Amino acid sequence: LVDIALAAWVASRMGKAKRNLWYSPHLKTDYALSDQDSLPGFDDWCVLATPGHTDRDLSVMHLPSKRIYIGDLLVKVKDRFIPPIPVNYPEQYRASILKVQALRPASLMLAHGREVMLTEANYAHVLTVAPRKPFTIWTPAKNKLQRLLLRKKG
C-alpha cells in the first residue's frame, strides 16, 4: 500500500491525472539477472546492479548508444535530480550513483520522467543530498515528532 500511495503522490507532483493502481505484492521471477549479464533476447543491453533504493534494483544499458534506463535510481522534482523515497541502503545507493556516473552514459532514462542528460554538477548534487542513513516515507514524520518532543522537554 505504501508503494501505491507513493506512486500517487509522485504522479500528483508531476501533474499527472489520477488512475487506479494495483499490483500483486508477490512477483514471479522470469529470469534471474546479475550485474553485467546480457538481457535475454537483447544482446546489446547489459544489466547493471544498482541497489540502494531497494536491495534488488537493476538498471539496463544499451551498449551501442550508452543510454541507461535507471528506473527509480533518481527522480526529478522541480527541476532537481534527487534520490527516490525510500533509500533503504544508503551506502549501496551512493555506490550505484558513482557506478552510473563512471560509465559516462550518453543519457539516462527515468522511470518517472523522460530521457535526461546529467552534468557533473547534477551527480554532485545527488551525492550531497543522498541520505547517509536509511530514509523511508516515515522518516520526515518521525524526525519532526522527535524535534517536537525534545522541544517540550527543554
Can you annotate each of these PLM segments?
Residues 1, 26, 100, 105-109, ...:
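Intrinsic structural disorder
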Residues 1, 78-83, 142-143:
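Short, charged, surface-exposed secondary-structure boundary motifs
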Residues 21-24, 38-40, 44-121, 125:
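Metallo-beta-lactamase
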Residues 116-154:
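Binuclear metal-ion centers of metallo-dependent hydrolases, dominated by the metallo-beta-lactamase
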Residues 1-5, 36-42, 137-142, 154:
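Short N-terminal signal/transit or membrane-insertion segments
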Residues 1-31, 132:
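Active-site HxH/HxHxD metal-binding segment of metal-dependent hydrolases
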Residues 28, 33-37, 46, 146-154:
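Extended recognition/assembly regions associated with phosphoester-bond processing machinery
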Residues 1-5, 87, 126-128:
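Short, hinge-like loop/turn segments at secondary-structure boundaries
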